[in-house]
């Protein structure tokens, strides 16, 4: 067999991972020696073979529908991938495919041990040949289901299609930000599905085979593939390792096909300590140990701890993985460079996970620690792990404070008939203690409407103040044409926005009105002012021609205008 460093046409390393067509049966001398593999490694390889077989099944269904619906031979050749098969056949005349070579090697290994009845190989090979003949272009499917957490900080985006590959199941984008800024990868751990307690305590999780069979897979063109047929079952049973996939271990590819993940009952606790170092402007999270964790696999877990400093969803830190341990001792310090003033309103999220080498990591529990109420002089603390609650920065009641002054100038109050109509003045001074969406600072501006007029003509805004969490705007906006009666029906909406290269994102805002719920006799959702906001607006009405000052929270729960 050629060495890894010297790939050749006949070697495994020269073979594509997803075959397009099938060559002749590998010769016996070209097979691989797999006698050194452990049972767990055999199951892992068998999982890849099963995924490959299911992808072939899906691709055959897609190609057959294309042949029935596309009349143009040239377009059909491109859509079905026949062009690639022809090009490959000219370049590699006798090359075998990796899946065929590994499958044949596993059959030979099994037969050598005497675990299969005579003639089994011939039947399996016939099933493989019957099933795998014909062109099969590369299939592209979603690696993992769309993330249901909202790391929900913006509009939902469809999960982009990525080539199926053995990627790191841990790294994930959690961001659904502004339009056009959605992540281009979906990874397994960050797309953790909503967990439900498993009945039976430490009962071993079982693959959801019914869902895998019933949820017929969706191809790139949006069509559904036909269900499995007996020839596929024969192909999957061509080695004992493939048949062993009925056990509790699922590969990442199978997880993606079924669209569901396994859940374990959350239990146990985590021991940790928090310390802030003013000199280094650094928050230090000392993860000491966990006790009584749930067993994820075969009465064991491979746990590690992951932390986020919410609402920054890019602030992930992780400990090392402790193998086969339900009471792991980590003794690791996770560090965050953050000014002490920014800790107000931040929430530390500590979650415990089982590291799955081939599939989706399994959630074991989490705790959330609001830092504004934390006793920094306390000793290391034990907290019980809780079921998963999707972290959403939008759940924060406020993202900072807005300092402003208001003044109402009635018509003719300045003499000589000036101003000709009532004027409403807004002096936007500054924002304080803003909470960023991600690590780093913000590029912010304030936008103002006086409702019910939400047209672009009514919109005014400040300049953009870049790279600051306490931006100073010092900007005045003036609206005219308002009488005292109009102010009782109006609502001034001031919102703070993060300016992005592709799109802007609202961080929070305030609404100044009497909060009656109606405007000019109509019920409206934007008359939802808080007591603080009502008090400031009432002071404006009672003190014409005088500035009234306010320091208001930038609410994240502003009701939609319509």
From Swiss-Prot:
Biological processes per GO annotation: exocytosis; intracellular protein transport
Composition bias type Basic and acidic residues, residue spans: 118-153
The keyword Transmembrane helix belongs to this UniProt entry's keyword annotation: no
Membrane topology: Peripheral membrane protein
Cellular compartments per GO CC: exocytic vesicle; extracellular exosome; melanosome; microvillus membrane; plasma membrane
A GO molecular-function annotation: small GTPase binding
Region annotation Disordered: where it falls in the sequence: 1-29, 94-255
Principal subcellular localisation of the protein: membrane
Residue positions where Phosphoserine is found in the record: 216
PROSITE patterns for this protein: C2, RABBD
Biased composition (Low complexity): 233-255
Residues annotated as domain RabBD: 31-87
Location of this chain's protein in the cell: Cell membrane
Known tissue expression: Highly expressed in bone marrow and lymphoid tissues. Detected at lower levels in cerebellum, occipital lobe, prostate, stomach, kidney, appendix, lung and trachea. Expressed in cytotoxic T-lymphocytes (CTL).
Residue ranges annotated for the C2 domain, each copy included: 266-385, 398-527
SUPFAM superfamilies to which the protein is assigned, alphabetical: C2 domain (Calcium/lipid-binding domain, CaLB)
Function: May play a role in vesicle trafficking. Binds phosphatidylinositol 3,4,5-trisphosphate. Acts as a RAB27A effector protein and may play a role in cytotoxic granule exocytosis in lymphocytes.
Subunit note: Monomer. Binds NRXN1. Binds RAB27A that has been activated by GTP-binding via its N-terminus. Binds NCF2.
Protein name stated in the entry: Synaptotagmin-like protein 1
Gene source species: Homo sapiens (Human)
């Amino acid at each position: 067999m050629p060495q890894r460093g010297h790939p050749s046409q006949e070697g495994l390393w020269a073979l594509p991972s997803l075959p397009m067509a099938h060559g002749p049966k590998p010769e016996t001398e070209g097979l691989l020696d797999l006698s050194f593999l452990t049972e767990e490694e055999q199951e892992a390889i068998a999982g890849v073979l099963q995924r490959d077989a299911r992808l072939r099944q899906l691709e055959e269904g897609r190609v057959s529908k294309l042949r029935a619906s596309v009349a143009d031979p040239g377009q059909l050749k491109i859509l079905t991938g026949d062009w690639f098969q022809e090009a490959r056949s000219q370049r590699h005349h006798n090359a075998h495919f990796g899946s065929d070579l590994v499958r044949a090697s596993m059959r030979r290994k099994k037969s050598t041990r005497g675990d299969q009845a005579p003639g089994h190989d011939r039947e399996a090979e016939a099933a493989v040949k019957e099933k795998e003949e014909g062109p099969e272009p590369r299939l592209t499917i979603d690696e993992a289901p769309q993330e249901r957490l909202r790391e929900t900080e913006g509009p939902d985006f469809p999960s982009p299609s990525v080539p199926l590959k053995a990627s790191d199941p841990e790294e994930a984008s959690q961001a659904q930000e502004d339009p056009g800024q959605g992540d281009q990868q979906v990874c397994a751990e960050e797309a953790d599905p909503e967990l439900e307690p498993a009945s039976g305590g430490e009962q071993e999780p079982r693959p959801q085979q019914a869902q895998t069979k019933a949820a017929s897979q969706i191809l790139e063109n949006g069509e559904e593939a036909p269900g499995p047929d007996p020839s596929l079952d024969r192909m999957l049973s061509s080695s004992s390792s493939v048949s062993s996939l009925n056990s509790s271990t699922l590969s990442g590819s199978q997880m993606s096909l079924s669209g569901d993940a396994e859940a374990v009952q959350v239990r146990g606790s985590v021991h940790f300590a928090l310390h802030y170092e003013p000199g280094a402007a650094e928050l230090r999270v000392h993860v000491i140990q966990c006790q009584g964790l749930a067993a994820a696999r075969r009465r064991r877990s491979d746990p590690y701890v992951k932390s986020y400093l919410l609402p920054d969803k890019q602030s992930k830190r992780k400990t090392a993985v402790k193998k086969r341990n339900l009471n792991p001792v980590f003794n690791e310090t996770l560090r965050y460079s953050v000014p002490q003033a920014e800790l107000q309103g931040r929430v530390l999220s500590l979650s415990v996970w089982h590291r799955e080498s081939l599939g989706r990591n399994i959630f074991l529990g989490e705790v959330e620690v609001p830092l504004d109420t934390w006793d920094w002089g306390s000793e290391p603390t034990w907290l019980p792990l809780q079921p998963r609650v999707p972290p959403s920065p939008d759940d924060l009641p406020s993202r900072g404070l807005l300092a402003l002054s208001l003044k109402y100038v009635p018509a003719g109050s300045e003499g000589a008939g000036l101003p000709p109509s009532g004027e409403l003045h807004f002096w936007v001074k500054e924002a304080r203690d803003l909470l960023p969406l991600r690590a780093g600072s913000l590029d912010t501006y304030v936008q103002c409407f006086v409702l019910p007029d939400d047209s672009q003509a009514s919109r005014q805004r400040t300049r953009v103040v870049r790279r600051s969490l306490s931006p100073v705007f010092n900007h005045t906006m003036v609206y005219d044409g308002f009488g005292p009666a109009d102010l009782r029906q109006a609502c001034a909406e001031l919102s703070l926005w993060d300016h992005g290269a592709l799109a802007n994102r609202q961080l929070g805002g305030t609404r100044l009105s009497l909060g009656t719920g109606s405007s000019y006799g109509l019920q409206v959702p934007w008359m939802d002012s808080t007591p603080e906001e009502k008090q400031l607006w009432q002071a404006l009405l009672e003190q014409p021609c005088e500035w009234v000052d306010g320091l208001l929270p930038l609410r994240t729960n502003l009701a939609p205008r319509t």
